[in-house]
């Protein structure tokens, strides 16, 4: 068995609360989002893990979640690498719009296709496949080698950037991944084999709370 990979979706953001498409826009966490990140950190502290390095995105909601988790495991000063390769899916022209307003403008069916299809992007934005096309190579070059060397690695990122990782790690089809939602602040702990396959997966919390 090799190292450990922990994935955590950021806590609720201001724009999650306002029902806005966020993407690469940069709102901060809400009070609930802070509590969710702290709860995820406490779950990891209770689990007894100590990290060797952390990765997060270029966006403040993921960075703050990462820091709150590290604070909870008493590793506030741990080396943390920030990279936009881990950013949320870019919603393009939908970014900043209220989801109900978007449905009124383009129609409920079209917005549903943009949100939930695997390979149809919104205007000027990314599909889930596009998101995976930047997340997965970064994982292979920057994150996976650390895990395979035996390190314990934290990745605090976003719903869609993490779903694109989970799709490959869990061996999900594109139909299965479209039905998967990741709860905010709930850590997923992967133990990897030396050949990079998954030896075990534990979810430290209630993933049914995903939205």
Swiss-Prot record:
Give the keywords, sorted.
Gluconeogenesis, Glycolysis, Isomerase
Amino-acid positions noted as binding substrate in the UniProt annotation, renumbered to this chain: 9-16, 22-23, 61, 88-91, 99, 115-116, 159-160
Q: Any idea of its EC number?
A: 5.4.2.11
According to its UniProt record, this protein's enzyme class is isomerase
Gene Ontology biological process terms, A to Z: gluconeogenesis; glycolytic process
The positions flagged as active site in the entry are 10, 88
Q: Which InterPro entries match?
A: His_Pase_superF_clade-1, His_PPase_superfam, PG/BPGM_mutase_AS, Phosphogly_mut1
Q: Which GO terms describe its molecular function?
A: phosphoglycerate mutase activity
Segments traversing the membrane: none
Which residue stretches, if any, does this entry annotate as coiled coil?
none
Q: Which reaction does it catalyse?
A: (2R)-2-phosphoglycerate = (2R)-3-phosphoglycerate
Which CDD domains is this protein grouped with? HP_PGM_like (cd07067)
Q: Where is this site: Transition state stabilizer?
A: 158
Q: Write out the pathway annotation from the protein's UniProt entry.
A: Carbohydrate degradation; glycolysis; pyruvate from D-glyceraldehyde 3-phosphate: step 3/5
Q: How does it assemble?
A: Homodimer.
- Purpose: Catalyzes the interconversion of 2-phosphoglycerate and 3-phosphoglycerate.
Sequence similarity:
Belongs to the phosphoglycerate mutase family. BPG-dependent PGAM subfamily.
Q: What is this protein called?
A: 2,3-bisphosphoglycerate-dependent phosphoglycerate mutase
Query: Which species is this record about?
Result: Sinorhizobium medicae (strain WSM419)
**Lineage summary:** Bacteria, Pseudomonadati, Pseudomonadota, Alphaproteobacteria, Hyphomicrobiales
| The encoding gene | gpmA
């Amino acid at each position: 068995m090799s190292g450990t990979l922990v994935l955590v979706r950021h806590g609720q953001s201001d724009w999650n609360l306002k029902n806005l498409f966020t993407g690469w826009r940069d709102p901060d966490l809400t009070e609930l989002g802070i509590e969710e990140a702290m709860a995820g950190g406490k779950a990891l502290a209770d689990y007894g893990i100590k990290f060797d390095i952390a990765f997060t995105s270029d966006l403040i909601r993921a960075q703050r979640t990462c820091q709150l988790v590290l604070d909870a495991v008493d590793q506030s000063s741990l080396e943390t690498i920030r990279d936009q390769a881990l950013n949320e899916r870019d919603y393009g022209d939908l970014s900043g719009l209220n989801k109900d307003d978007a449905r009124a403008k383009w129609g409920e069916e079209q917005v549903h296709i943009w949100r939930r299809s695997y390979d149809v992007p919104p205007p000027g934005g990314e599909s889930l496949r596009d998101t995976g096309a930047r997340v997965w190579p970064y994982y292979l070059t920057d994150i996976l080698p650390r895990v395979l060397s035996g390190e314990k690695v934290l990745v605090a990122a976003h719903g869609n950037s993490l779903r694109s990782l989970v799709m490959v790690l869990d061996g999900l089809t594109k139909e299965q991944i479209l039905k998967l939602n990741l709860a905010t602040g709930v850590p997923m702990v992967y133990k990897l084999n030396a050949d990079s396959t998954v030896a075990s997966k534990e979810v430290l919390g209630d993933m049914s709370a995903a939205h």
